Amino acid sequence: MRPWPAGSADRNLPLVMMPHGGPASRDHAGFDWWAQAMASRGYLVFQPQFRGSEGFGQELLEAGYGEYGRKMQTDLSDAVEYLAGAGLVDRERVCIVGASYGGYAALAGVTVQQDIYRCAVAVAPVSDLVADLARDRREGGRDRYNTSLRYWMRFLGVDDHNDPILATLSPARLADRADAPILLIHGRADTVVPYEQSEFMEEALSRAGKEVKMVTLDGEDHYLSFPATRLRMLEETIAFLEEHNPPR
């Protein structure tokens, strides 16, 4: 958790659930400019090391295999319930924010899951797993040496890129289930998660009559490498949170 918001009573705080990217990655105890920006506005920011995270032993990493969109997702909502039960956060004032895999988790939190979050912010997210695996297969080849495809299929728990379960875990294909406002932010020059993944989500949400805002960062890559676009992302994120989940 990020430091307690200044001036808070340390109880019943508004929460930002912030899963990291990867998913085979981790958060560190050092300075995090994005998390700290939200904490400075009065939010308790929780960065969970959910199953599938690396750096805590092989058992935790492998516990994520086959759990993408499943137990990797409920690890987050279980943390919400724990923090609320301990009186640290207000169960009715919770949003989810993330980038890359964390962006997928943010979208899944209000589509695959429901009745948990008041809003979702997804930066450079995968929204359609079917389309994303098809791209990986097309660009990386179909054989066993396509390490990217094997990585994703291991976490997704599928043996075929056309497995029907992928549609049931794809937020863009579940847009009619969205139960909270969604902010999408994506760099147009992203070569890791293509910009079209946010376009898929925005178009599906709009067709379903759901509340969505999309912010395009022209010339920006997956990692938000430019200070000006990082600043814009922070401003858009905080404004969206304060609109839909006011800290005070």
Name these PLM-found stretches:
Residues 21-25, 45:
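Serine-hydrolase catalytic-loop signature spanning alpha/beta hydrolases and amidase-signature enzymes
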Residues 1-11, 170-175:
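Short beta-strand-to-loop junctions in surface cap/lid or active-site-entrance loops
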Residues 48-248:
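Active-site-proximal cap/loop segments of hydrolase catalytic domains
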Residues 13, 43, 117-118:
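Short beta-strand segments enriched for Tyr within beta-sheet-rich domains
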